[in-house]
UniProtKB/Swiss-Prot annotation:
Keywords: Molybdenum cofactor biosynthesis, Transferase. Its EC number is 2.8.1.12. It comes from the Bacteria. GO terms for biological process: Mo-molybdopterin cofactor biosynthetic process. It comes from Rhizobium meliloti (strain 1021) (Ensifer meliloti). Coiled coil: none annotated. Heterotetramer of 2 MoaD subunits and 2 MoaE subunits. Also stable as homodimer. The enzyme changes between these two forms during catalysis. Pathway: Cofactor biosynthesis; molybdopterin biosynthesis. The gene is moaE. Belongs to the MoaE family. Substrate binds at L39, C40, R41, H103, R104, K119, K126, K127, E128. This is Molybdopterin synthase catalytic subunit. It holds the Pfam family MoaE.
Amino acid sequence: MAAPVTVRVQRDDFDIAAEVSALCRARTDIGAVVTFSGLCRDEAGALSALELEHYPGMAEAEIERICHEAVERFGLQAATAIHRFGRMEPGANIVLVATASPHRQAAFDGANFIMDFLKTSAPFWKKEHHADGSAGDWVSAKDADDAARDRWTRR
């Protein structure tokens, strides 16, 4: 049986507990579930919102490709990846990655792999909106994100 993969790109918030429940529903072969939730953060106290845009259709396809690669590479029994778009205030959910496997290490590795590639390969763009009402810049990609992704190619 192929491992189920759930991918959604949506404007609405998600319920982490409900997503984990759906991931594990009627499964007795799962011994470990790992979740990662990414939140909108305000590091300097000047952010009122973060605006996320994506390339519809292409973002979903790329995330699905990444999830299927993780399932194959780590022997996952299920994977879920949800990414939001639109305007979000600090503290709001942005992304959820959940992986299930018989053992914890595969679940951890799968979640890390999905997040590292999602962050660098899926077509999303972020724009900051400042508390003073001004629009900030589009957020640039970080070298650290590329390095995190590249570690998987050296294994």
